[in-house]
Amino acid sequence: MNFTKSEALHKEALEHIVGGVNSPSRSFKAVGGGSPVAMERGKGAYFWDVDGNKYIDYLAAYGPIITGHAHPHITKAITTAAENGVLYGTPTALEVKFAKMLKEAMPALDKVRFVNSGTESVMTTIRVARAYTGRTKIMKFAGCYHGHSDLVLVAAGSGPSTLGTPDSAGVPQSIAQEVITVPFNNVETLKEALDKWGHEVAAILVEPIVGNFGIVEPKPGFLEKVNELVHEAGALVIYDEVITAFRFMYGGAQDLLGVTPDLTALGKVIGGGLPIGAYGGKKEIMEQVAPLGPAYQAGTMAGNPASMASGIACLEVLQQKGVYEKLDELGAMLEKGILEQATKHNIDITVNRLKGALTVYFTTNTIEDYDAAKNTDGEMFGRFFKLMLQEGINLAPSKYEAWFLTTEHTKEDIEYTIEAVGRAFAALADNK
């Protein structure tokens, strides 16, 4: 493939935009460098870049585009909203309708509030939990990303009984000291941390199914134990379902797994591709939020008609019969084909899949926590990523990210992708 225009555009972008990208995950730094491909148009499961190259897209904008690009039902809803004015600064019927849809889909949401991003929704659930409990410390699991606010850009300390350290320049040590990080899927270290800090903990942040170091499911009974131990300590359980809500079923991962949190943060899929976030939970906790309570949260763009209309339309598409069964069927087909090609070409991989999302790790080890994901072969993934790009397959440029299927992918797309994987694995095998 020819990437001349993408390369020229990136060179120009570097003169005007920091790092040439508006989110570091779009850079090719994690896959060996080079100019990221600039896309010009998306339709269904496909992308076309500025050079005219066509791709089957498994990035799906890191998850939100579950109905494919430019879905006609969603596009019509956005267009209608735009024609009626995109921002009012007043209540609307659309926000009430959308809130009711979310509550019906996720029974743990007694009350909801709309914001503008997943980062905002997580940030606000933390504030609400602190207001409700009167405590300040937060717990999270290593490797789980909860947005770019100072509150959660925190790395693990030297052990579960130590406090966190900043995971970004500009995050004060004093804020990091309010966060305790423990390994995912490890009850003993969670218990050890709670034994020491539990009386100061306001809440624990949980990705019920991890999406930020690949697709990693909880061990049987792990989430139930988290609820038990955290509630015993007098703290709240917050589920970050920014990636997982409406991805695996119509509703949340909490409903798929049968475990109920106190608060839930939402984003990505629920906006149908437009900026959005939402949070909700138990009535008595949510009533801490202004104007009813002392926990302040506001937003000029929150609940804007365009995002509400897009979100409603997206959920209407996902309500249709057979949507999630199709995603699961295609996901299973893709996983099987990738594993067969790996065996054929003697490439060591592990695939973690849940329904229509999967991650390919270059390792033979089981991936159940961040340390295991971190120790996979990133150099091999980088080579694989660029080989797949040449084959017309668009993946996330990071070994940690998932492949996301959409309602618009077809069996023919999967068959071609498996063939492309085979050619990429053959090239990797030739250059071991």
Curated annotation (Swiss-Prot):
Cofactor(s) listed: pyridoxal 5'-phosphate
Catalyses which reaction(s): (S)-4-amino-5-oxopentanoate = 5-aminolevulinate
Pathway the protein contributes to: Porphyrin-containing compound metabolism; protoporphyrin-IX biosynthesis; 5-aminolevulinate from L-glutamyl-tRNA(Glu): step 2/2
4Fe-4S keyword on record: no
Top EC category: isomerase
NCBIfam families: hemL, PRK00062.1, PRK12389.1
Protein's name in the database: Glutamate-1-semialdehyde 2,1-aminomutase 1
Organism listed in the record: Bacillus mycoides (strain KBAB4) (Bacillus weihenstephanensis)
Gene: hemL1
